[in-house]
Design a protein with these regions (language model features):
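FNR/FR-type flavoprotein reductase catalytic core
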Residues: 1-112
Length: 112
């Protein structure tokens, strides 16, 4: 997720917390700077439900994906954020060998 595009993931996390449903989920959350990071309390609570959050100031690249999600080839990816970020992430994942059928996208334009 990029920037405020993390909002749909906060909703998913709240659902898991409320239903006490465990999920093997890894959230890669990038932001331009630390002051833009939102929903930290929600994601902290989601760790009780099996979520792991990896915060990144700056751009998520292939090495970061490999480091944080070693089993990336078997995962389903949900990408939400500004269109340029979503398209770049999708291309990057396809380049890593992730099936395009395992990549779900949501363009989140934010307030701009």
């Amino acid at each position: 997720a990029g920037g405020i595009g993390v909002t749909p993931f906060a909703s998913m996390a709240r659902h898991c917390i409320k239903s006490e449903e465990n999920r093997d989920a890894v959230l890669l959350y990038s932001s331009k700077n630390a002051s833009e990071v939102v929903y930290q309390d929600v994601f902290s609570s989601a760790s009780r439900c099996g979520w792991r959050i990896a915060y990144r100031i700056g751009v998520i690249d292939t090495e970061y994906i490999k480091q944080e999600v070693p089993d990336y080839a078997e995962r389903t990816f949900y990408i939400s954020g500004p269109p340029s970020m979503v398209n770049a992430m999708k291309s990057m994942l396809i380049g890593l060998g992730v099936s395009r059928f395992n990549i779900k996208t949501d363009f989140f334009h934010g307030l701009a």
